[in-house]
Amino acid sequence: MAKTNISPGMQQYLDIKKDYPDAFLLFRMGDFYELFYEDAVKAAQLLEIGLTSRNKNAENPIPMAGVPHHSAQQYIDVLIELGYKVAVAEQMEDPKQAVGVVKREVVQVITPGTVVDSAKPDSANNFLVAVDFDGCRYGLAYMDVSTGEFCVTDLADFTSVRSEIQNLKAKEVLLGFDLSEEEQTILVKQMNLLLSYEETVYEDKSLIDGQLTTVELTAAGKLLQYVHKTQMRELSHLQALVHYEIKDYLQMSYATKSSLDLVENARTNKKHGSLYWLLDETKTAMGMRLLRSWIDRPLVSKEAILERQEIIQVFLNAFIERTDLSNSLKGVYDIERLSSRVSFGKANPKDLLQLGHTLAQVPYIKAILESFDSPCVDKLVNDIDSLPELEYLIRTAIDPDAPATISEGSIIRTGFDERLDHYRKVMREGTGWIADIEAKERQASGINNLKIDYNKKDGYYFHVTNSNLSLVPEHFFRKATLKNSERYGTAELAKIEGQMLEAREESSSLEYDIFMCIRAQVETYINRLQKLAKILATVDVLQSLAVVAETNHYIRPQFNDNHVITIQEGRHAVVEKVMGVQEYIPNSISFDQQTSIQLITGPNMSGKSTYMRQLALTVIMAQMGSFVAADHVDLPLFDAIFTRIGAADDLISGQSTFMVEMMEANQAIKRASDNSLILFDELGRGTATYDGMALAQAIIEYIHDRVGAKTIFATHYHELTDLSTKLTSLVNVHVATLEKDGDVTFLHKIAEGPADKSYGIHVAKIAGLPKSLLKRADEVLTRLETQSRSTEIISVPSQVESSSAVRQGQLSLFGDEEKAHEIRQALEAIDVMNMTPLQAMTTLYELKKLL
């Protein structure tokens, strides 16, 4: 659009916009934020607001759209949620006192990863991530600007980077120019992330002091530099950098967490139906965030797990004290985010009142914790800082009925400041003085309806109707003439008005200054407030886990160093909660030292996947310190969980079910150790039957011979059950069924040995397929079973067997070379991937005739 012949104000807009080409520029003009040119056109569509124009009669009118300043945040939120950036330009001087164009500057750039002041508060973290690559390893740093959390790690490959970003649910990723185009495409297209490019020149090492690798230091510096550049202020709430190692936690990919419904239900993308939903009896926003973090990162340190267990046990044993604790925590507000608002200079009187109310609860919480009389709880108590001096400051300074905005007044309590009290007295008594003057002049003048009114233009004045003008005293002076009346003033009234106006202006200015001073004092306590927030969040999560354990009759798991899994009458905690205790059928799970693989067979809908997920959730809950759903649990400590449960194409990246299966299987066999847990459900079903079965067998053998991880492998390939005769650490289990008078009942109980049937037709019957179709399927099944009984397991020696064994096991399929050549040619001509089942059977019949 043409931008010629523009006004000085528009030139100012363009000069500012030039520095923020990738952001919507909200340009403050009076009571509105205006957008112009392309920003206005696009914003009008996205925000569903009116599009008008500036200088409508000009040859090239400027497109314009605007939003009221008091409701701007909700519009900013919409743009941010859509993945855009917003630059906010404020008026830096009073327009009444400005000479020429009002000075304006951008005071903040809001991006998806730097949201602090949302109109829709959310207790979840909002992470901004920075990634750096040095040609060998990746540095990854992340920060929640709204809470001050700041962490860094280094990772070996991009797969780990992608998984960590997904686990963090990052909204924005900062890159240098060192990632490949393919990696950047994955982040943008497959993960729907906003990428920002930032070269690191950050020199302030105060927040990133420590033993970091160069790539970690660069990633952390990139993050800090971007945050300071967009927020344009010192952020005192940013916490010291925490270095963490992925290996210090139970490792799980995003796909694994999604398949297990850890923090949200994969089918609905909602919290309901997830482990997070089940375990969340927290009372604070800080506790909710920490609980989610614990679920995302279960521990691998036995000592740390037992510490959590011990406190949960103490809470369980004291119902009354725990109930008092829960009730007290309800009065705790989000200290972390309140602290960030203070740091950003955005905390209002209501924010400080919430902070003060929280601090008033802390002594009660501390006393309740002391009443448990437990050494493990005392460790928490000893670290609690009640900040009594800050609580006293807020309680004595801020009026409990203070408004949410600073400009409305009535913020500071009476008695806190003598000067402010004096001005308020003048305003309060001035009203009485005016009433006295009104009564005195009414009596002296004889004007019975004489009264004093007020407006902004004329101030205080006597209102005299035309019929009484002859009675107006000489000391009255005219201020305004109306059609039916006159407005008068007096020296006495003007004096009182002057005193009241001065008191009002001085009071407003002084009250603002006092509030700013108090907020500055609060800012000096931010580090102590953040430490208190961490302790209260920990207490909240532990009491939540105690409540859940008691409500659902969970038990305290044990841990062993013998590589043994013993779960007696275990339950899938989430399914049980949804179904109800009476409906759920528990299952025991057992792996002795010699057993590394359970091969589970049985029909669909019988409970194989639930059985596998049950084990995974039990491990996760146990290693995050929670009690678990079972009668007895004894587990080894796992270092990682790998799953492939539930088939789904990766439509975004164009990868088929089979490709996704193979990629996830590859990650498992490459990364798993003998301390890992692998759960594979129907691996290989995404390709031709024999291809799938061959791969499934090879993967099982590889895990058995080379990995040694505890593994549950569910399959429809019943032929694979014969592997138990050659793999010493593999056992067969199946889902029990009851067959009577042609009807089949799935018992949902795991039993030893392989399944004898798949009952696929029965599942189809349950699904409601037509009876004629089911009858035909029975006929075909009977014929197929008659023609060819189950294919025997392929006894091809694995790589660990000797070459002599290979020679001894080699079979000759053909009697002579001529027939062999003819059949070989026929086989080579077959296009297996494009054959229908009927064509395959016909071809097989023709080949059989050649023998």
Swiss-Prot record:
GO terms for cellular component: cytosol. Gene3D superfamilies: 1.10.1420.10, DNA repair protein MutS, domain I, MutS, connector domain, P-loop containing nucleotide triphosphate hydrolases. It comes from the Bacteria. Coiled coil: none annotated. Keywords: ATP-binding, DNA damage, DNA repair, DNA-binding, Nucleotide-binding. Belongs to the DNA mismatch repair MutS family. This is DNA mismatch repair protein MutS. The lineage of its organism: Bacteria, Bacillati, Bacillota, Bacilli, Lactobacillales.
